[in-house]
């Protein structure tokens, strides 16, 4: 990862990679033997020095040998240590690492790792060869992305907001939570703060600039973050403002098509979205529920496979509620999830609770509801699986990780606090629970300031099944997975063998309906991976 601030200074990140070998730099050791016997001042010291060297060198030799053994032993449990890697992949990896090191050396001795993603995004896009390579990398699955912020919002503004009858709520009260909210009405609402967007556009001198302001209002770009609580309120507020667009029937399917296109172009073959329960609407006021959405998505996946000639492409849906909801609401949602799971078993896969963990109810608060759902699940062919957000917090006393594991969660969303729980890490490894790391999200939402210190690196070095996801990329002003992979490549010193294993991890922890679907996904990814290796060798061998 690198950064250049407005041509003032350059930044370099020094990458230490000990994966394919160990380089030991030993300082010259000078031993000065002082002879206290005045009668021996003129004695030839060569034999004395030779004797000292023979005494010390065996120690150094043994030390270096033990050191190399220790480092190699630790490397054996790190990500990628057992990943198959042939000679051609090694050739591509050498090229990849040379490019990475050259990019680092082209910048000054300042460190970018603590800089916010918003500041460096344009530099990454314009100046990094490594980023271009990662864009071409087949990434497997994106396992943690929220449906209503899964693809960039430019589609909502450039297409959705130009549809007839689009209104925006505008008031001079900056504290009004509804300010900037979009919605479609068949006629002018009684509340005069709702303004017809087409009329507003007719009155502005620069429509392109106006639309850019609308788009910026749906991201965290340029906002005064304030403290952690204020940041989360601004973050949540965007979901409220955009809801009237993403749930409007003429836009809903198009937005998901936009997601599919962005992910496929970025090398993603399998997507799993968290979809909060809520209805869709049309201009007549007719309501379309989550059953409609799941069925519509199954149809859209079929057309997408044909459009892109990708028989392996898949979408899975995880139903969810905000963790601020009461027990009754959560129970009803889980009952619906159980029904959806059995009506659409190849698409609807489970349930989660979302939202800031430090402000909403902990998982233990809903233990009676979980117990009832477990009992109810015996009446169905498919029980309800869980994919809990847990450990997305900076507080020491958060208990959600304990309950997520005890409730047999299939994966853990974020898991930032997991390295503080050695026993839980052992259980995650033993039970093969996938961990969904969302690095850019974690930085922007102030869980991690310096990407090099991201706790995911500890999990990765322990050999836990880490996967990489974008979380809410639309609000963070990007699409796909390449930016997250890029951030970690620079900050964690990842090589191609490790990137390969991250992609494999994502496939292994995907919700494939059966072995046939898994084989289809993995085999298609593997073909793309070796094409990617050829691309690196053919394109960058002479650099």
UniProtKB/Swiss-Prot annotation:
The EC number on file is 3.5.4.4
Q: Which residues are glycosylated?
A: 126, 179, 309, 326, 397, 508, 514
Q: Which residues bind substrate?
A: 232-239, 355, 472
Single GO BP term: inosine biosynthetic process
Give disulfide pairs as residue numbers: none
Q: Which reaction does it catalyse?
A: adenosine + H2O + H(+) = inosine + NH4(+)
Which residues take part in binding Zn(2+)?
144, 146, 389, 471
What are the positions of the active site?
Answer: 392 (proton donor), 414 (proton acceptor)
> Where does the protein end up?
Secreted
Signal sequence, start to end = 1-26
GO MF terms listed in the record are: adenosine deaminase activity; metal ion binding
Q: Which InterPro entries match?
A: A_deaminase_dom, A_deaminase_N, ADGF, Ado/ade_deaminase, Metal_Hydrolase
- State the family named in the UniProt similarity comment for this chain: Belongs to the metallo-dependent hydrolases superfamily. Adenosine and AMP deaminases family. ADGF subfamily.
The record describes the protein's role as:
Adenosine deaminase that may contribute to the degradation of extracellular adenosine, a signaling molecule that controls a variety of cellular responses. May play a role in the regulation of cell proliferation.
Full protein name: Adenosine deaminase 2
- Origin species, per record, is Dictyostelium discoideum (Social amoeba)
Question: Taxonomic classification, please?
Answer: Eukaryota, Amoebozoa, Evosea, Eumycetozoa, Dictyostelia
Gene name of the encoded protein: ADA2
């Amino acid at each position: 990862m690198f950064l250049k601030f407005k041509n003032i200074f350059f930044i370099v990140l020094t990458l230490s990679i000990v994966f394919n070998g160990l380089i030991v730099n030993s300082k010259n050791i000078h031993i000065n033997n002082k002879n206290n016997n005045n009668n021996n001042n003129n004695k030839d010291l060569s034999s004395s020095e030779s004797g000292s060297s023979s005494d010390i060198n065996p120690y150094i030799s043994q030390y270096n040998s033990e050191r190399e053994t220790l480092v190699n032993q630790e490397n054996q449990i790190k990500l990628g240590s057992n990943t198959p890697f042939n000679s051609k992949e090694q050739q591509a990896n050498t090229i990849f690492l040379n490019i990475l090191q050259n990019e680092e050396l082209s910048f000054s001795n300042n460190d970018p790792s603590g800089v916010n993603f918003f500041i460096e995004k344009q530099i990454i896009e314009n100046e990094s060869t490594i980023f271009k390579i990662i864009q071409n990398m087949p990434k497997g699955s994106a396992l943690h992305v929220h449906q209503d912020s899964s693809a960039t919002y430019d589609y909502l503004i450039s297409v959705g907001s130009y549809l007839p009858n689009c209104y925006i709520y505008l008031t001079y009260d900056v504290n009004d939570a509804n300010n900037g909210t979009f919605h479609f009405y068949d006629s002018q609402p009684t509340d005069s703060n709702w303004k017809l967007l087409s009329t507003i556009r007719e009155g502005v001198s620069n429509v392109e600039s106006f639309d850019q302001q609308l788009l910026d209002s749906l991201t965290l770009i340029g906002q005064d973050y304030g403290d952690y609580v204020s940041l989360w309120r601004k973050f949540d507020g965007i979901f409220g403002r955009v809801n009237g667009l993403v749930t409007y029937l003429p836009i809903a399917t198009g937005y998901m098509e936009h997601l599919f296109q962005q992910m496929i172009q970025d090398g993603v073959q399998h997507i799993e979205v968290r979809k909060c329960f809520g209805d869709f609407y049309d201009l007549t006021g007719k309501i379309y529920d989550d059953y409609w959405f799941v069925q519509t998505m199954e149809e859209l996946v079929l057309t997408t496979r044909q459009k892109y000639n990708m028989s392996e492409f898949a979408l899975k849906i995880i139903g969810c509620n905000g963790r601020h909801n009461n027990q009754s609401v959560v129970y009803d949602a889980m009952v619906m999830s159980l029904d959806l799971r059995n009506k659409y078993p190849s698409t609807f896969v489970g349930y989660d609770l979302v939202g800031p963990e430090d402000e909403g109810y902990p998982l233990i608060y809903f233990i009676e509801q979980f117990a009832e759902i477990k009992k109810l699940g015996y009446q169905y062919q498919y029980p309800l699986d869980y994919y809990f957000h847990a450990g997305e917090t900076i507080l020491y006393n958060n208990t959600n990780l304990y309950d997520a594991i005890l409730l047999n969660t299939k994966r853990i969303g974020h898991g930032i606090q997991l390295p503080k729980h050695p026993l839980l890490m052992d259980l995650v490894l033993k039970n093969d629970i996938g961990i969904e790391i969302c690095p850019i999200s974690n930085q922007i939402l102030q869980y991690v300031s310096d990407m090099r210190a991201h706790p995911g690196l500890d999990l990765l070095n322990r050999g836990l099944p880490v996967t990489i996801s974008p979380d809410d990329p639309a609000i963070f002003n990007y699409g796909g997975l390449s930016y997250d992979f890029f951030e970690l490549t620079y900050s964690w010193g990842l090589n191609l063998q490790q990137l390969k294993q991250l992609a494999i991890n994502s496939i292994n922890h995907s919700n494939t309906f059966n072995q046939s679907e898994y084989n289809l996904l993995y085999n298609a990814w593997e073909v793309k991976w070796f094409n990617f290796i050829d691309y690196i060798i053919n394109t960058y061998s002479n650099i």
